[in-house]
């Protein structure tokens, strides 16, 4: 991933 905003949902 590069989306470390939505990874930890």
UniProtKB/Swiss-Prot annotation:
Organism per entry: Tityus serrulatus (Brazilian scorpion)
Q: In its keyword annotation, does this UniProt entry include Amino-acid biosynthesis?
A: no
The beginning of the lineage is:
Eukaryota, Metazoa, Ecdysozoa, Arthropoda, Chelicerata
Q: What is this protein called?
A: Venom peptide 3
Q: In which tissues is it expressed?
A: Expressed by the venom gland.
Q: Where in the cell is it found?
A: Secreted
Keywords annotated in UniProt = Secreted
Tell me where on the tree of life, at the top rank, the source sits: Eukaryota
Keyword Oxidoreductase tagged: no
- Coarse class of the protein's main subcellular location: secreted
Regarding protein family, the annotation reads: Belongs to the non-disulfide-bridged peptide (NDBP) superfamily. Short antimicrobial peptide (group 4) family.
